[in-house]
UniProtKB/Swiss-Prot annotation:
Subunit structure: Part of the 30S ribosomal subunit. Contacts proteins S5 and S12.
Entry keywords, A to Z: Ribonucleoprotein, Ribosomal protein, RNA-binding, rRNA-binding
HAMAP family referenced in this protein's UniProt entry, alphabetically: Ribosomal_uS8_B (MF_01302_B)
Name assigned to this protein: Small ribosomal subunit protein uS8
Cellular component GO terms, alphabetical: ribonucleoprotein complex; ribosome
Record organism: Streptomyces griseus subsp. griseus (strain JCM 4626 / CBS 651.72 / NBRC 13350 / KCC S-0626 / ISP 5235)
Family of the protein in this entry: Belongs to the universal ribosomal protein uS8 family.
One of the GO BP terms on file: translation
Length: 132
């Protein structure tokens, strides 16, 4: 059965694993999910990620990050642009998540970027998700 929104599925798996204090989470692999994982690692929300071969296709494995007393590094994740309601932002009107404490993941013509990176490059795009 095909998935309607694979990005929402990825974010939900990540949110659930984070809430249950799992060390890692496994999901089906795609290029856009790998790029989102790369942004999450650069911003310090996860410790790492890798692609593993599965019986059918490939799996993406995200290693979750916790503080010294098992504090979660991800407080929240929200999918913004959905298949039924796309949300776009101009370069002059890019969103700030929690006043700059969180990260907006934006799909631009330069690839997936954070809100800050898109602002520096002067490009807008589709707002995929907020992570804080």
């Amino acid at each position: 059965m095909t998935m309607t929104d694979p990005i929402a599925d990825m974010l939900t798996r990540l949110r659930n694993a984070n809430s249950a204090y799992h060390d890692s989470v496994v999901m089906p692999h795609s290029k856009i999910k790998s790029h989102i994982a790369e942004i999450l690692q650069q911003e310090g929300f996860i410790t790492g990620w890798k692609v593993e071969d599965a019986e059918v296709g490939k799996n993406l494995v995200l290693e979750l990050k916790f503080g010294p007393n098992r504090e979660r590094s991800i407080a929240g994740i929200k999918r913004i642009s959905k298949p039924g309601l796309r949300v776009y932002a101009k370069s002059t009107n890019l969103p700030k998540v929690l006043g700059g404490l969180g990260v907006a993941i934006i799909s631009t013509s330069h690839g997936l970027l954070t809100g800050q990176q898109a602002g520096k490059k002067g490009v807008g795009g589709e707002v995929l998700a907020y992570v804080w």
